Design a protein with these regions (language model features):
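Non-catalytic, solvent-exposed segments at the cell envelope interface
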Residues: 1-348, 356-358
C-alpha cells in the first residue's frame, strides 16, 4: 500500500507461500514457548503467534527484506476477515464468480470456514486475493466524508479487538499509530490494566470458527495500596457437531494429514497453546482449569512473564480457566481483557465491578 499526499493505492497481493522459504528471525524464548506439541518454525505463517504486534511487525519486515520485493517500508498494516467484513458493510456487497454474495454479515464466516468447504487449497488463495483486493481498493477509493467517518470509527473498534493493526517504523509518527492503539501488544500499561489471554491452534486445521469463548471478570477487592483484585473465568467450547464432523475435510478437522508430521490431536479436537499475561506491574495467581489441560509452565517471552499450557477441546466439550488477577497500584481504570481475535465483534465478556469503586 502506498500513500502520496492523501492518495492511497493498493499494490499486488502475494500468497504467504512465496515467503515461507525465507526463514525466520525468532528468539530462543519465542521458540521455547512454541516448541510443542506443534513446533512453530516462525516462518511468515507463524508470526502472529507472538502477541506483541511491535515484535510481529519487526519479524515481518525482516522477511520482506529477504524477498525479491525488498525495499524500505514505512510500517506494517495487518487485517483479518472481520476487518474485511466491516469494510464490505461500508462499501457494499461483493459477488463472486460462482454467484455467491459476500455481505457485511457473512464475509468473515466465508473466509474463516465456508471457503474451506467450497474450494480446494489452490483455489482458496485466488479467492482470498480477490476478496481482499476488492475490499481494500473499495475502502480507499471514491472517498466521501461520511465514508471516511465510518471507516475511521470502524478502525478504532477493530484495532481494540485486534482485527486491525497499523504500525510505523518512524519514531516521529508512532504517536499516531502505536500511541493511538492501532498496534496492540500484550499488556504493557500499569495505569490502564489488561489481562491478556491468547490462543494458538496446535492441531493443524481450520477449527477456529467452531470455538466459542465466554469470559467473566469480577472485581473482588480494592486494595489499600491502590491496586485491585479480580476473579477471571475464561471458557472455550468446541461447537463442532457430529454432522459437521462427518462432512468436513481433514483440512478443516486436522488430525492425520498429508505433509503434517505426527498427530497432535484427533480430527475435530482443537489443541490450543494458551498464553496468560498479567497486567503490567500486576500478577496472576491461583490458575486452575477444568477439562483436558496439560503441561502448565511459567515462561518469559519478549521481556514479559507469562503462564502457558495446552488445552485439548474435543467436539462438544468445554475447557474453563479460573484465576485471580491483581493490578498495579498505579491502575487508574478497570481491568479489561485483551485476547486473540475471533470471527465476530461480540467478545462475550461480562464485567462486574460492583464490589468496590476505584479510589
Amino acid at each position: 500500500m502506498q500513500v502520496d499526499n492523501g492518495n492511497i493505492s493498493v499494490g499486488e497481493f502475494h500468497s504467504n507461500k512465496e515467503f515461507v522459504a525465507l526463514g525466520e528471525s525468532a528468539t530462543a524464548e519465542e521458540h521455547d514457548v512454541f516448541s510443542d506439541p506443534l513446533y512453530f518454525s516462525f516462518d511468515v505463517r507463524d508470526l502472529f503467534a507472538v502477541p506483541d504486534f511491535s515484535r510481529t511487525a519487526e519479524m515481518l519486515n525482516t522477511v520482506w527484506q529477504r524477498s525479491e520485493y525488498a525495499c524500505d517500508i514505512d510500517g506494517v498494516i495487518a487485517i483479518d476477515p472481520l476487518f474485511i467484513q466491516e469494510m464490505v458493510r461500508i462499501n457494499g456487497d461483493i459477488t463472486l464468480d460462482n454467484g455467491q454474495v459476500l455481505t457485511g454479515d457473512n464475509t468473515a464466516e466465508f473466509m474463516l470456514n465456508g471457503i474451506y468447504k467450497a474450494f480446494d487449497p489452490d483455489t482458496q488463495d485466488m479467492y482470498f486475493e480477490y476478496v481482499a483486493s476488492a475490499v481494500m481498493d473499495g475502502a480507499f477509493s471514491n472517498m466521501t466524508m461520511d465514508k471516511m467517518m465510518q471507516i475511521a470509527q470502524a478502525m478504532g473498534t477493530l484495532a481494540e479487538g485486534r482485527h486491525f493493526y497499523a504500525y510505523t517504523f518512524h519514531e516521529d509518527e508512532a504517536e499516531y499509530f502505536q500511541g493511538a492503539g492501532f498496534a496492540k501488544n500484550a499488556p504493557d500499561s500499569e495505569t490502564d490494566p489488561e489481562v491478556g489471554i491468547y490462543m494458538n491452534e496446535q492441531n493443524a486445521s481450520k477449527l477456529g470458527w467452531y470455538l466459542r469463548r465466554s469470559s467473566t471478570i469480577t472485581r473482588t477487592a480494592c486494595n489499600a495500596d491502590g491496586s485491585q483484585t479480580y476473579h477471571v473465568t475464561f471458557s472455550i467450547t468446541n461447537t463442532l457437531t457430529s454432522d459437521e464432523m462427518a462432512s468436513a475435510t481433514t483440512y478443516i478437522l486436522g488430525g492425520a494429514q498429508p505433509g503434517v508430521d505426527g498427530i497432535v490431536a484427533p480430527a475435530g479436537t482443537s489443541a490450543q497453546r494458551m498464553l496468560f499475561y498479567a497486567p503490567a506491574g500486576g500478577s496472576i495467581t491461583n490458575l486452575t482449569a477444568s477439562g483436558d489441560v496439560r503441561d502448565q509452565e511459567n515462561k518469559t517471552m519478549d521481556g514479559k512473564n507469562l503462564i502457558t499450557n495446552v488445552a485439548y477441546i474435543a467436539p462438544g466439550e468445554t475447557v474453563t480457566f479460573d484465576f485471580d488477577v491483581t493490578t498495579s497500584a498505579k491502575a487508574e481504570s478497570d481491568l479489561r481483557l485483551d485476547q486473540t481475535p475471533a470471527g465476530w465483534l461480540d467478545e462475550n465478556v461480562t464485567y462486574d465491578t460492583s464490589a468496590c469503586s476505584l479510589k
